[in-house]
Amino acid sequence: MDIEELKRRLIAEVIDREGGYVNHPADRGGPTCWGITLQVARDNGYQGDMRALPRPLAAKIYANRYWHSLKLDDIAAMNRDLAMVLFDFGVNSGPGRAAEYLQIQLNVLNNRGRHYADIKVDGAVGEHTLTALRKHANIRGESGLFLLAHTVNAERIVFCRRLAERSESQEAFTYGWFRRVVELLSHVLHQRPVPREWIDEVAA
């Protein structure tokens, strides 16, 4: 499938997995619908009842906030596994954090600056981050990008564990978080049958 179809399918799968309205008492993000938190919905101009958040609007938010902000069209052109990891990481923990972990991994993989210069860990994927990623790909090849995808994904386990250690209430979600991360690159999550119309309604 092409990159546009990959983006649409991943967004539709997240919406399907997250489901409709949820207001878990331990969720610090408050009520969600289709996985979109109240604050994110408000930030994107939605002022209605979260129970009525339109699914096409949720899809648009996922595309803009979690795909395009991380430059995942560019990254998917290099390695789709890495794009999938960063998208799911962004959805689960915020796009800024996903970008930071990518930048940290690139900095420790540059052989003390011999392969490319360190980049600023600022949580924003821009030209410096993409240039470092391209240089990493040129030097290490496809296997290097595959390794990078796995190392970023592995860091998520540590991040989620620390959340639960700091706040016992978050243990309500720990098993699900761990399972989500572990299953991601086995593509278990990406074999979910979702309605074709959900995929098609994701805006380009």
What are these regions (language model features)?
Residues 1-204:
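Cell-wall polysaccharide-cleaving catalytic domain and substrate-binding groove, primarily
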